Amino acid sequence: MPKMVRHDFSSALGQITTARYWQCVKENKIHMTQTDSGWAKFAWGKIYGQWICGAAVGAYDTEKFHPIDMIEAMERIRPSTFCAPATIYRFLIKEDLSKYDFSYIEHACLAGEPLNPEVFHQIEKLTGMRIYEGFGQSESSVLLANYPWVEIKPGSMGKPAPGYDIALLDENGEECEDGMVGSICIRVDQGHPTGLFRDYWKDDAAMEKSFKFGYYNTGDTAWRDGDGYYWFVGRNDDVIKCSGYRIGP
């Protein structure tokens, strides 16, 4: 069943890492994250860290998503930074983008679901945008991401975000070697990371399941390559997401 995630007021400060280091928002410029208001990324992807860093926020909202309508809205708003789920990028490559100029976008990123490398390369070819993929949760700020100071590996979640001590653990709490699949876990026994939630409200069973061995277990699995990049595998629970939407439970 869905869980209520309780944050304290310091969580908004954790989103500075999201905005400044991953999304690369700039003071007095416009950032645009394309997401629905029912998704946690609406808050951590376009409001908290972005406003703290001094950026204005551009928005495109409609009952039904149309790629060309969004592009035309972006041409009016002219955001310097842009973020969207993978499905939107997949929609974009199906359109004739030759008549549009995307040069005003200085930095583009993605979260919500993995992006296949073929779409990454096609977006770069058609628009000039290189997409910096990241991974976060309702429970946190961005946890893993591709950053401007490291080489992008298309399809990878990237590397740990500043402020988080992240490990891949097996079911016994032992660290996984490179190439092995494990649960993405955040160390909490040496201090509570700014940006991480405090608890699942009135849900002791969820807390007991998620906090073990001195770590918070995200419920997501991945493997790590020899260069320290993480690659998404799946969920440990029954959460189903498609096109950035939570379908079940």
For the regions a language model picked out, list residue spans one by one.
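Short beta-strand-to-turn element immediately C-terminal to the catalytic PLP-Schiff-base lysine
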Residues: R6-D8, L144-P148, L169-D170, I186-R187
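Conserved AMP-binding/adenylation subdomain of ANL enzymes
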Residues: L13-I30, Q34-S80, E95
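Residue-level recognition of short loop/turn positions
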Residues: D170-N172, V181, G226-D227
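Conserved ATP-binding/catalytic segment of the ANL
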Residues: E177, C185-P249
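Alpha-helix/helix-capping structural signal
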Residues: S10, T87-R90, E113-P114, G191
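Active-site glycine-centered loops adjacent to acidic/histidine catalytic or metal-binding residues
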Residues: G112, G136, G158, D220, ...
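Gly/Ser/Thr-rich phosphate-binding loop
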Residues: I52, P79-C83, I93-K153, D165
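Conserved AMP-binding A3 loop
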Residues: M1-T17
